[in-house]
């Protein structure tokens, strides 16, 4: 079984993760355009949940397409 995760960059597509990568992750942080464009969002597959830097938000999940882009989620 291989997991389906959304991956950036845009266009954001759900892709099959490589064997051994059984988590989807969402990583968000602010860059210099944060006030006008919002947070930078990185989506992808991982074998282990990426470690979080102090300025980042990282969430991981383990079901197909469980990491949609925050702006694409219904409110």
Curated annotation (Swiss-Prot):
<feature type="disulfide bond">
    <location>
        <begin position="61"/>
        <end position="66"/>
    </location>
</feature>
<keyword id="KW-0008">Acetylcholine receptor inhibiting toxin</keyword>
<feature type="signal peptide">
    <location>
        <begin position="1"/>
        <end position="2"/>
    </location>
</feature>
<feature type="disulfide bond">
    <location>
        <begin position="17"/>
        <end position="45"/>
    </location>
</feature>
<keyword id="KW-0800">Toxin</keyword>
<dbReference type="InterPro" id="IPR054131">
    <property type="entry name" value="Toxin_cobra-type"/>
</dbReference>
<keyword id="KW-0732">Signal</keyword>
<keyword id="KW-1015">Disulfide bond</keyword>
<keyword id="KW-0964">Secreted</keyword>
<comment type="subunit">
    <text>Monomer in solution, homodimer in crystal state.</text>
</comment>
<dbReference type="Pfam" id="PF21947">
    <property type="entry name" value="Toxin_cobra-type"/>
</dbReference>
<comment type="function">
    <text>Binds to muscular and neuronal nicotinic acetylcholine receptor (nAChR) and inhibits acetylcholine from binding to the receptor, thereby impairing neuromuscular and neuronal transmission. Blocks muscle type nAChR. Also binds with high affinity to alpha-7/CHRNA7 nAChRs. In addition, shows a weak inhibition of neuronal alpha-3-beta-2/CHRNA3-CHRNB2 nAChR. Selectively binds to alpha-1-delta subunit interface of the mouse muscle nicotinic acetylcholine receptor, with a 10-fold higher affinity for the adult than for the fetal receptors.</text>
</comment>
<dbReference type="GO" id="GO:0005576">
    <property type="term" value="C:extracellular region"/>
</dbReference>
<feature type="disulfide bond">
    <location>
        <begin position="49"/>
        <end position="60"/>
    </location>
</feature>
<feature type="disulfide bond">
    <location>
        <begin position="5"/>
        <end position="24"/>
    </location>
</feature>
<protein>
    <recommendedName>
        <fullName>Alpha-elapitoxin-Bc2b</fullName>
    </recommendedName>
</protein>
<dbReference type="GO" id="GO:0099106">
    <property type="term" value="F:ion channel regulator activity"/>
</dbReference>
<dbReference type="InterPro" id="IPR003571">
    <property type="entry name" value="Snake_3FTx"/>
</dbReference>
<dbReference type="InterPro" id="IPR018354">
    <property type="entry name" value="Snake_toxin_con_site"/>
</dbReference>
<dbReference type="InterPro" id="IPR045860">
    <property type="entry name" value="Snake_toxin-like_sf"/>
</dbReference>
<dbReference type="GO" id="GO:0090729">
    <property type="term" value="F:toxin activity"/>
</dbReference>
<feature type="disulfide bond">
    <location>
        <begin position="30"/>
        <end position="34"/>
    </location>
</feature>
<keyword id="KW-0528">Neurotoxin</keyword>
<keyword id="KW-0629">Postsynaptic neurotoxin</keyword>
<comment type="similarity">
    <text>Belongs to the three-finger toxin family. Long-chain subfamily. Type II alpha-neurotoxin sub-subfamily.</text>
</comment>
<dbReference type="GO" id="GO:0030550">
    <property type="term" value="F:acetylcholine receptor inhibitor activity"/>
</dbReference>
<keyword id="KW-0872">Ion channel impairing toxin</keyword>
């Amino acid at each position: 079984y291989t997991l389906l995760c959304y991956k950036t960059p845009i266009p954001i597509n759900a892709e099959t993760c490589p064997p051994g990568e059984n988590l989807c992750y969402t990583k968000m942080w602010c860059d210099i355009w944060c006030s006008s464009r919002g947070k930078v969002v990185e989506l992808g597959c991982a074998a282990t949940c990426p470690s979080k830097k102090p300025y980042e938000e990282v969430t991981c999940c383990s079901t197909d397409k469980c990491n949609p882009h925050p702006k694409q989620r219904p409110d």
